[in-house]
């Protein structure tokens, strides 16, 4: 049992820097705060899409962690300048709390001009309103 615990501890120490590096080099992160509770919104699905000639193409999807964050939403492919959007699937979040919402999905469009910068999209959320901005 001691060997198992030691092996698990060593494995997590080895993996943690690699995961932090991956998140640190990723150009896109999101964060959701529930304004009604003042707490993070965990488990919310977020979809990343790129604008194309005839609509939108999905690039990636993820779920917010216990802190309401997705630290690395950009897919492994290289970033390119262009128009993108993240869609926060908030309907299921409120449904799980047995609350109604006016906004079951919140699409946030943004433009990437410099692929060597980090883009952070925070969402401040309530049942009947939201706000967002370019974070850091």
UniProtKB/Swiss-Prot annotation:
It catalyses: 5-hydroxyisourate + H2O = 5-hydroxy-2-oxo-4-ureido-2,5-dihydro-1H-imidazole-5-carboxylate + H(+). It comes from the Bacteria. Catalyzes the hydrolysis of 5-hydroxyisourate (HIU) to 2-oxo-4-hydroxy-4-carboxy-5-ureidoimidazoline (OHCU). InterPro entries: Hydroxyisourate_hydrolase (IPR014306), Thyroxine_BS (IPR023418), Transthyretin/HIU_hydrolase (IPR000895), Transthyretin/HIU_hydrolase_d (IPR023416), Transthyretin/HIU_hydrolase_sf (IPR036817), Transthyretin_CS (IPR023419). It is an enzyme of class 3 (hydrolase). Homotetramer. Gene3D superfamilies: Transthyretin/hydroxyisourate hydrolase domain. It is found in: Periplasm. The keyword Magnesium does not apply. Belongs to the transthyretin family. 5-hydroxyisourate hydrolase subfamily. Keywords: Hydrolase, Periplasm, Purine metabolism, Signal. Pfam families: Transthyretin. This is 5-hydroxyisourate hydrolase. Its main location: periplasm. The keyword Nucleotide-binding does not apply. Its EC number is 3.5.2.17. Residues 1-20 form the signal peptide. GO terms for cellular component: periplasmic space. HIU hydrolysis also occurs spontaneously, but more slowly. CDD domains: TLP_HIUase.
């Amino acid at each position: 049992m001691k060997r198992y615990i030691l092996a698990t501890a060593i494995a997590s120490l080895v993996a943690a820097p690699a995961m932090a590096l991956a998140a640190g080099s990723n150009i896109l992160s999101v964060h959701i705060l529930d304004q009604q509770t003042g707490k993070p919104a965990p488990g919310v699905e977020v979809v990343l899409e790129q604008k194309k000639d005839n609509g939108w193409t999905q690039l990636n999807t993820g779920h917010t962690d216990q802190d309401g964050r997705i630290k690395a939403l950009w897919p492994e492919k290289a970033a390119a300048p262009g128009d993108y959007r993240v869609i926060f699937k908030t309907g299921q979040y409120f449904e799980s709390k047995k609350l109604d919402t006016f906004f079951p999905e919140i699409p946030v469009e943004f433009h990437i001009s410099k692929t060597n910068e980090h883009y952070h999209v925070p969402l401040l959320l309530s049942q009947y309103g939201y706000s967002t901005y370019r974070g850091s």
